[in-house]
Amino acid sequence: MAEITAALVRELREATGAGMMDCKKALTEAAGDMEAAIDWLRTKGLSQAAKKSGRTTAEGLVGVASAKNRAAMVEVNAETDFVGRNEAFQAFVEQVAHVALEVGDDLDAIKAGKVPSGRTVADELTHLIATIGENMAIRRAKVLSVESGVVASYVHSALRPGIGKIGVLAALEAPSESDALLTLGRQIGMHVAATRPAALDVASVDPEALERERAVLIEQARESGKPEAIIEKMVEGRIRKFYEEVVLLEQVWVLDGESRVAKVVEKAGAKLVGFERFQLGEGIEKEESDFAAEVAAAAGTK
């Protein structure tokens, strides 16, 4: 049996990210064999990962990957903001985005894809859960592509290239790709990050959302006591204002505060055919922690 030295424990810890005492125990169980110790930790980690799978994951990162006329965006969640600053987690998000770029935005296909370690994305995720000690989940993915033109990506306040908490893809069709078109795409990404449009054009506005808005506007207009014919005109004017707020092509361009997005794109000789905006954790209800209950549980009391 090899001697369990501090250097050996440190080497195992650096290789796996596991705790010092766990590494020492693993080496003892494996009689000092490094590979066997790693396997022991992985087995232990798999058990831990299963226990953590029920925890809420509302933190994490958004990642993008681009290849000229195609781009992918993913959201990978974790339990705490601390994990988002972990380099191994950031690297994993990058890898998942690149897998999505290759295989598309079906989550099962992404999880079956391979990462540089040789593992599948699903296995790499399980390994990361065991190593870092938090539940994690690949929440969603989106891939946009065009036959001719560009799909630009933008990450707001990126922690590193292509990684942050808000990401946007913008698909522009044009006769050819150009640096100017890519720049416009990134500017559209910046605009979308700031304005949060709900639809690309008027035709793609959610009919139910539109009807709810119209019903509210009608009731508001009727309070004025004006005739129905005038109320109808008032409502139509306010619906146009609603479109300017939620429809990307109808919005005022944030870079000059005057032009419509549609005119900016038209002037560039392009057509904006799609966009996607991911904001980390949107729609996820975070769990409220009961600190007193946690302390009581840890102490074995109720």
Swiss-Prot record:
Among InterPro entries, the record links this protein to: EF-Ts_dimer_sf, Transl_elong_EFTs/EF1B, Transl_elong_EFTs/EF1B_dimer, Transl_elong_Ts_CS, UBA-like_sf
Q: Does the keyword Transmembrane apply?
A: no
SUPFAM superfamilies assigned: Elongation factor Ts (EF-Ts), dimerisation domain (SSF54713), UBA-like (SSF46934)
Record carries keyword Protein biosynthesis: yes
Its main localization is: cytoplasm
What's a single GO CC term here? cytoplasm
Localization recorded for this chain is: Cytoplasm
GO MF entry, a single one: translation elongation factor activity
Show the segment(s) annotated as Involved in Mg(2+) ion dislocation from EF-Tu: 80-83
Enumerate the UniProt keywords alphabetically.
Answer: Cytoplasm, Elongation factor, Protein biosynthesis
Role this protein plays: Associates with the EF-Tu.GDP complex and induces the exchange of GDP to GTP. It remains bound to the aminoacyl-tRNA.EF-Tu.GTP complex up to the GTP hydrolysis stage on the ribosome.
Family to which the UniProt record says this protein belongs: Belongs to the EF-Ts family.
Task: State what protein this is by name.
Answer: Elongation factor Ts
